[in-house]
């Protein structure tokens, strides 16, 4: 009985536990069921909200930005160059003139105001007349006129500066100087030489003369307090950019220019291990030419006028010759004040040098890309052209204008780049340029001379406009795919740049700015406000901007442009894309309201 009683008691306890367990299971099931209904409802509601938000974006799919307003800068900022500001020079060292290099202000020190034109500013004289004269009030600098009056760089006549084509090394005029140069370098006559760089350009008379001979020159000079060389060049309608060979590479890829020129530019070529000449070597195309006039060339007849001794100049010339030979340059021609050296067209010379462990300068190692040129330090070593490139040398490069539409060999270095991509890009920009001209008839007229394509790929717009009376500075982002070598291989010019910073030019230097997806590609890094302020700084009064952007950014850009005193209209692209819009803008000509009060 005891056993049975115990078993009964256990059974009775078990019978009480079972209903509780079943009840617990039922309650859990009910809760899951109800929870599922609730969550399902919630999911449906969230989904509906997402759809509603999506549909609202479809209606107004655009970036919303805070309203901005810009005051006028004071009149002493009329020639403000943020990254080469003479006001800041004393903060930087004088060694190798590093203070003249780019030193951009931090965000908290950036100017958020509109740069005014000089008092009495007028719309620039139109090309080609501008090559010979400009308004004095637009570039009111008398230093060259007073200090170089005997050299005929320029002279002031009434309200204008006149450019007679003189210079330190061409007293008989720049045309006679270039005629002699062409006699020494026949490749200047037949389209072999298309791109050139002029270091220490003066008022860019050399580059201006070459334009008439089918050679496109980048005139280079540093920012200064009194000469304004680059500003004069751009006011004349001649390509130019602020820059100096100091401690950093110039913002150009390797093997780019067909010719480099220095006319008494006073660069100490043999000092500091020859790094300045090594930089010229880097950017010069294999088989390209380096032209030097002035000390120490023709020292035998000129040394007395150089405030030196014949022994010192002979020594300088011998050092220069030795340095050039060590870089695989050969003397090509020499007459009177002009000497021409040619860079080795192949790598045989460099291979011989590498067998000598004591050779100087050494070959650069693989740790530094030859095309790396944005805040990249100069190094005392030779950049040897890549042996895989067989058609980059000057002789193998198609002559101008054939090279403009020939697929460059270096497009294979661009991710996804090939001949088909190049041809498609070329065709695409012909269509786009035709559409632009319908929307902005000023393109092709004398109203537009200096043009910047702010984020080009292969220079397609510049190629499409090549027959118009204008030139294009092609800008490739230092953060984008390296397509700038392709631009140069086509016979066009350009530079690397980061649009989170100011460009290396004076205010009021471009007639037309072209933007293609810049804000889309750089929106994560660069503040739209600062980019557009920079566009306003470098755009001439009454100048134009064509902004090709996603619909998402278009309205915000137009809103900021209004505060810049631009007038903009929205247009369809040539394909009437719903995802992309065109803004055709014009900058207003205005004068500083602070000028009179500041002068009183």
UniProtKB/Swiss-Prot annotation:
Main location: endoplasmic reticulum
EC numbers: 2.1.1.-
Family under the similarity heading: Belongs to the methyltransferase superfamily.
Annotated Pfam families: Methyltransf_29 (PF03141)
Residues bearing attached sugar chains per UniProt: 594
Broad enzyme group: transferase
Record carries keyword Cytoplasm: no
Localization (cell): Endoplasmic reticulum membrane
Domain of life assignment: Eukaryota
Lumenal-side positions: 38-600
Transmembrane segments: 17-37
Bilayer topology: Single-pass type II membrane protein
InterPro entries in UniProt: Put_SAM_MeTrfase, SAM-dependent_MTases_sf
Cytoplasmic compartment spans: 1-16
Name of the protein in question: Probable methyltransferase PMT21
Cross-referenced PANTHER family: METHYLTRANSFERASE PMT21-RELATED, SAM-DEPENDENT METHYLTRANSFERASE
Organism: Arabidopsis thaliana (Mouse-ear cress)
Keywords in alphabetical order: Endoplasmic reticulum, Glycoprotein, Membrane, Methyltransferase, Signal-anchor, Transferase, Transmembrane, Transmembrane helix
GO terms for biological process, alphabetical: methylation
One GO CC term, this protein: Golgi trans cisterna
GO molecular function, one term: methyltransferase activity
Induction entry: By dehydration stress.
């Amino acid at each position: 009985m005891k056993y049975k009683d115990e078993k009964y008691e256990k059974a009775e306890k078990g019978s009480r536990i079972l209903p509780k367990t079943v009840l617990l299971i039922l309650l859990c099931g009910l809760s899951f069921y109800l929870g599922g209904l609730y969550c399902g409802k919630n999911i449906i509601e969230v989904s509906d909200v997402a759809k509603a938000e999506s549909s609202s974006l479809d209606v107004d799919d655009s970036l919303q930005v805070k309203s901005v307003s810009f005051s006028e800068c004071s009149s002493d900022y009329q020639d403000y160059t943020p990254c080469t500001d003479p006001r800041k020079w004393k903060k930087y060292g004088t060694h190798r003139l590093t203070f003249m290099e780019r030193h951009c202000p931090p965000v908290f020190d950036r100017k958020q105001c509109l740069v005014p034109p000089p008092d009495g500013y007028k719309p620039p004289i139109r090309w080609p007349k501008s090559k010979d004269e400009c308004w004095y009030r637009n570039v009111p600098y008398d230093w060259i006129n007073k200090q170089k009056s005997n050299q005929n760089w320029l002279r002031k006549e009434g309200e204008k500066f006149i450019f007679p084509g003189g210079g330190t090394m061409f007293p008989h005029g720049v045309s006679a100087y270039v005629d002699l140069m062409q006699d020494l370098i026949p490749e200047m006559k037949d389209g072999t030489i298309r791109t050139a760089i002029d270091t220490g350009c003066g008022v860019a008379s050399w580059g201006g003369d070459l334009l008439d001979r089918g050679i496109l020159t980048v005139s280079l000079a540093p920012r200064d307090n009194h000469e304004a060389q680059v500003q004069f060049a751009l006011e004349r309608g001649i390509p130019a950019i602020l820059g100096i060979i100091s401690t950093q590479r110039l913002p150009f890829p390797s093997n780019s220019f067909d010719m480099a020129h220095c006319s008494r530019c006073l660069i100490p070529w043999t000092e500091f291990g020859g790094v300045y000449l090594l930089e010229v070597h880097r950017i010069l195309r294999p088989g390209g030419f380096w032209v030097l006039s002035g000390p120490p060339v023709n020292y035998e007849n000129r040394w007395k006028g150089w405030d030196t001794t014949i022994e010192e100049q002979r020594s300088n010339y011998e050092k220069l010759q030795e340095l050039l030979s060590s870089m695989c340059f050969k003397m090509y021609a020499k007459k009177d004040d002009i000497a021409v050296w040619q860079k080795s067209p192949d790598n045989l010379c460099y291979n011989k040098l590498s067998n000598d462990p004591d050779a100087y300068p050494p070959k650069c190692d693989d740790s530094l890309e030859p095309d790396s040129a944005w805040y990249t330090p100069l190094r005392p070593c030779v950049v040897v052209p890549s042996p895989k490139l067989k058609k980059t040398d000057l002789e193998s490069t198609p002559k101008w204008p054939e090279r403009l539409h020939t697929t460059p060999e270096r497009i294979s270095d661009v991710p996804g780049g090939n001949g088909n991509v190049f041809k498609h890009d070329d065709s695409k920009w012909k269509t786009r340029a035709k559409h632009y001209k319908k929307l902005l008839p000023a393109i092709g007229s004398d109203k537009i001379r200096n043009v910047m394509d702010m984020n080009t790929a292969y220079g397609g717009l510049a190629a499409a406009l090549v027959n118009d009376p204008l030139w294009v500075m092609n800008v490739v982002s230092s953060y984008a795919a390296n397509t700038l070598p392709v631009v140069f291989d086509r016979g066009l010019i350009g530079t690397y740049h980061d649009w989170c910073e100011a460009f290396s030019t004076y205010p009021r230097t471009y007639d037309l700015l072209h933007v293609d997806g810049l804000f889309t590609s750089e929106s994560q890094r660069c503040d739209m406000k600062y980019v557009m302020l920079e566009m306003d700084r470098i755009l001439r009064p009454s100048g134009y901007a064509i902004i090709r952007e996603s619909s998402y950014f278009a309205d915000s850009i137009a809103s900021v442009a209004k505060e810049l005193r631009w007038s903009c209209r929205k247009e369809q692209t040539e394909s009437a894309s719903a995802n992309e819009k065109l803004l055709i803008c014009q900058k207003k000509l205005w004068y500083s309201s602070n000028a009179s009060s500041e002068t009183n």
